[in-house]
């Protein structure tokens, strides 16, 4: 009969935490870390309730991009540069220099840390953006080739103990991480 079979996963307000993550993996190759499933699952459930019906794969992908990738929030990365500092004793530090916008106002920031993420956190602290502890990150390619795009999932812990997540996509995985932090 030569018919193609495409499995269907139905996502509605009663779906479990991992259903939306499975859809993202199958539709666009995003492998959300398990720790992120509940947060995104709640976002999908709220959207399904508001819509009053099941969500399509496209709607779920669009929702993920809106909530994590294309988010227009309080902060935005404008430009940056990393410099590696190699000490005589073998210690390596990373220096972040760049600018971000805070509520539309551009601010120059700089920080030094043990790597790109730490130096970015130090730079953010320099302009009073504190109260977040870096917990974890996961990254993987979403395309192939030496110019592949990578996605980075960031887990932060707020001072009140709440865990929150961000995600960023870029060909430079360091930039993907910064986007995931600042979103």
Task: Mark where each language-model region is.
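Terminal or standalone catalytic/regulatory effector modules within metabolic enzymes
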Residues: 1-183
